[in-house]
């Protein structure tokens, strides 16, 4: 287990930390808000694709759209975001944090317009690729920019604002999706859903034309006067805090130059990270945090909220979207929990408690879908599949093997023809014209359904069950638990873990891990639901989160109360800390130094 005693104030630079927190003005909040619009765009895209994909498969020029194409269109964005996050690290070191954020807002605007105008599935895919690049840029650089441009006493709160805006984006996406679902949704409404994303992207672009670069980046690139001016605005004119931050940044930069001299010829920053044990350790821990966050299934729940609600037994698309508004609103409200507590109870405790809640509600989600499966109507015996039934129709043999409605409708090629009299049904294949309103053969074939409409009902994605509301209620508590800590804290911790010279590259790697596993989880959800059942899928996510809980308990340190540069020492061995202390003492040329007192008792 990690045990860390407090680092002496000012342990990084030798400058005594001011005894009282500064009063912050409007500027720092305006700066942080403008940056975390990137989080809003992240959340909006995650939420709007869930609503839009209820209608995109019916759009002229795009249909037919099978589950593989749907998974590609949904999942290409997180896949490309992984590439974008990796590229934005070196890019932000060279061009600056501000320019990368501006580039992200421009790319997002173009991507939203292309998605809205798409007349084929390929064009829609291109738009989704551009959105992925923009989100990758923003998800990596926004937490870094906010952490480097925030007063240390509210840094955790402001970085948590990134996650808050993700949840705001989710809420707005579902509201916009609900509103536009009444405007010819199959041809026009889904286009308006995608187009709306250009509005906040343009707002962010305009804001950043007037906002400064990160003071740490400015100092590192020799623009020390500008760095001091920006810090003066951030700290609202409190010169003792400005001097303290300048000393911290100066010491960190001197250490970077020393490290570069020691590792001359080692090549790119990533090679230096891998050859520096304590930074390598921090990057591995940070990357695993991001990986485990995605393996909890969160973005599966976000991307496929509509599918999950329909699977629970809600048939109407409008109702599905408005229920999504409620669930995303709970997610938004839950984000205020870490904002209120992150600087009081610390990152580590909040993360552990949140993960325990996620585990419990993943178990409950799995149980709820198991109950739905057991309660769904059974299929007739095979010998009863006689009336107008053609066993040679494509997928007929596969549909025939399913024993109940839930198993049947989970397969994308099958629907359930329910007998209102017998309280059983037939599992029948969809027709080749991609219609979901009737079966390709059997009693619910178009002509038969018309003649026998009062006796039979065709269900394409859901089953009648008395447990309909249960998964929806559990999903609300799952999202509340997740947003209370597991959502923001991997981002907060990764923004704090690394020294200045490694920060952009290490955060790029950890963010890429988030997006890669986002891609893996979202790309496999529909297929996994068919192979392992819906309830089995959530039990798998639960198992992954249990492993994550053990990992966090033993390997993730508390960073509350430390400056960004002090956090680096939490990952050092005792011998490395002694050497670091010696360098600190020598750098002050005999001046009295506060000693560094801490222990990092763990094996990694």
UniProtKB/Swiss-Prot annotation:
One of its GO terms (biological process) is myo-inositol transport. Residues 1-20 are annotated as: Disordered. It is found in: Cell membrane; Perikaryon. It is a multi-pass membrane protein. It holds the Pfam family Sugar_tr. The chain crosses the membrane at residues 24-44, 72-92, 100-120, 122-142, 158-178, 192-212, 282-302, 321-341, 352-372, 469-489, 506-526, 536-556. It catalyses: myo-inositol(out) + H(+)(out) = myo-inositol(in) + H(+)(in). Belongs to the major facilitator superfamily. Sugar transporter (TC 2.A.1.1) family. H(+)-myo-inositol cotransporter. This is Proton myo-inositol cotransporter hmit-1.3. It comes from Caenorhabditis elegans.
